[in-house]
Amino acid sequence: MTNVPWLDACCASPLFRDLPRERTAALLEGRAELRSFSRGQDLDWYLRKLGIVTEGRLAVYNAGGTLLNQLHPGDMFGVSTVFTGYSSHITRISAAVNSAVVLIGEEELAAIFAEDFSVNRSYLAFLTDRIRFLNWKIDLFSASTAQQKLRLYLLHLRKEGSEVTVEPLARLGHTLGMGRASLYRVIEKLEGEGVIKRMERNRWQVDWERLCAE
């Protein structure tokens, strides 16, 4: 089983990336269901199953049809109904291109947790990251000015050092919920104040002390 092509994506997922490949293969033996689907096909059969994208790309939409996210090999989905009493999904997922996923049911996932606690810990860490991300999105939505939105976005990217990699500007405007003109104005303002410096491609240098003082 260690040579199956979809195992690479599972090993790259938040659930198994800290484990050796052989251990991941052993945990998934007899517990993973591989499903393939065509471009445009909706996923409506993964209730109470955790999914891992193994090939292609999935698109995630809200109830109104707005694109929320795109999932690539190694990304996970389906956590909103796993180990809960909910009988429906809060988003709609469809294949942006011909794709494949691995599905793990509740009972199988519980058995994996019982067999290897490190997977349980990784799952909890993934849920914590999701909560932090949702809180950030709420703060972003509540921000009243373009400058506040960009500030929150950059702080969300902050790691060690002064450099961050941002999204392409067209996508960044969509993420922040503002038009391109507004985005360019606030970028130029922060550049003029010495808060940020745009470098090659999508890399920016940020003066975190000045940004936090904004």
Where are these regions (language model features)?
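Polybasic "coupling" helices that flank or enter modular domains
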Residues: 114, 118-180
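Phosphate-/nucleic-acid-contacting segments
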Residues: 153-214
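Glycine- and acidic-residue-biased ligand/ion/polar-headgroup-sensing regions
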Residues: 48-64, 73-74
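Cyclic nucleotide-binding regulatory module and flanking cytosolic helices
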Residues: 1-39, 81-84
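Short beta-strand segments in beta-sandwich/barrel cores
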Residues: 33, 42, 57-62, 76, ...
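A short beta-loop-beta micro-motif enriched in histidine and acidic residues
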Residues: 30-31, 39-50, 64-66, 86-90
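Cyclic-nucleotide recognition modules
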Residues: 68-125
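A cytosolic small-molecule/anion-sensing beta-strand core signal
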Residues: 38, 54-55, 72, 97
